[in-house]
C-alpha cells in the first residue's frame, strides 16, 4: 500500500511515542507505570500508556492535566476575535490567574514568567526575523510555510485509539473551553473517564493552590492501587 506524504508526517508522532517508550523501558523495564501529562503532553502520555497497556503492562494511574483531545487545539472564537480583544482577554486571564493563586502560587507564577519572558522575547525576535526573511526570499518563505503546515499535521492528525483503562482528567473550569465537560476525551472509547474540575484557567493548573489539590487527589489514586495490590497478595 502506497503511503501519502500526510501518512509519513503523521507517523512522526508515533515515532516519538515509540522513542519515549524505549527510554521508559531502559529506566524501568516492567510496570506498573504511573503517568501524568500536562496540556499537549497529555496526548503523548495517553498514547504511551495505551501502547504499554496493550503490550501487557499495568497502568494504575493515567492522569491528564487539562489536556485536550480535539482535531484542532485552537478555539475558532478566539482565532476570529479582533486582535485588541484577544490581547485584552489574555491580560485579563493572567491577572485572574495571579489573583486567584495563593502566596506560594504567586511567587511560583512570577518566577515562571520571569524566565518565560526572556524566552518569549527571543522567540518573537526569531519570528520577526523569519517574516522579514520570508518577504526578501520567496523560496525561504515557501519552505517555512511548508514546515509550519507539517508541524500542524503532526499535532492534529494522529488518530488516537480507545483505551480500556481509567483516564483521570483534571479540567480547568475557566477559559475558552470551560463549558466542554471532558475536553473532548469522551469522544474516545475509554474503560472509564473520571473528571476532576479545577477552579482555574488552563495556565493556572501549574500553580498553587491547584498543584497541591492535584497532588493530593493523585495520591488518593496511588493509595487505592497499593491497597488493592495488598488485598490481591493476601488472597
Residue ranges and their predicted role:
Residues 1-235:
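A hydrolase-biased, glycine/serine/histidine/acidic-enriched motif that marks catalytic-domain neighborhoods
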Amino acid at each position: 500500500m502506497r503511503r501519502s506524504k500526510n501518512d509519513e508526517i503523521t507517523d512522526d508522532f508515533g515515532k516519538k511515542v515509540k522513542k519515549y517508550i524505549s527510554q521508559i523501558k531502559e529506566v524501568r523495564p516492567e510496570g506498573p507505570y504511573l503517568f501524568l501529562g500536562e496540556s499537549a503532553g497529555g496526548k503523548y502520555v495517553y498514547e504511551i500508556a495505551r501502547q504499554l497497556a496493550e503490550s501487557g503492562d499495568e497502568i494504575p494511574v493515567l492522569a491528564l492535566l487539562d489536556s485536550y483531545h480535539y482535531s484542532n487545539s485552537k478555539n475558532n472564537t478566539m482565532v476570529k476575535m479582533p486582535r485588541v480583544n484577544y490581547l485584552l482577554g489574555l491580560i485579563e486571564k493572567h491577572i485572574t490567574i495571579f489573583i486567584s493563586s495563593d502566596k506560594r502560587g504567586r511567587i511560583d507564577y512570577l518566577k515562571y514568567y520571569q524566565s518565560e519572558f526572556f524566552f518569549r522575547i527571543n522567540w518573537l525576535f526569531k519570528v520577526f526575523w523569519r517574516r522579514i526573511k520570508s518577504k526578501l526570499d520567496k523560496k525561504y518563505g515557501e519552505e517555512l510555510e511548508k514546515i509550519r503546515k507539517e508541524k500542524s499535521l503532526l499535532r492534529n492528525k494522529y488518530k488516537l485509539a480507545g483505551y480500556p483503562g481509567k483516564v483521570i482528567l483534571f479540567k480547568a473550569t475557566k477559559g475558552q473551553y470551560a463549558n466542554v465537560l471532558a475536553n473532548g476525551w469522551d469522544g474516545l472509547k475509554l474503560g472509564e473517564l473520571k473528571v476532576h474540575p479545577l477552579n482555574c484557567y488552563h495556565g493556572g493548573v501549574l500553580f498553587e493552590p491547584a498543584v497541591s489539590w492535584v497532588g493530593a487527589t493523585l495520591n488518593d489514586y496511588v493509595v487505592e492501587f497499593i491497597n488493592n495490590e495488598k488485598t490481591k497478595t493476601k488472597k
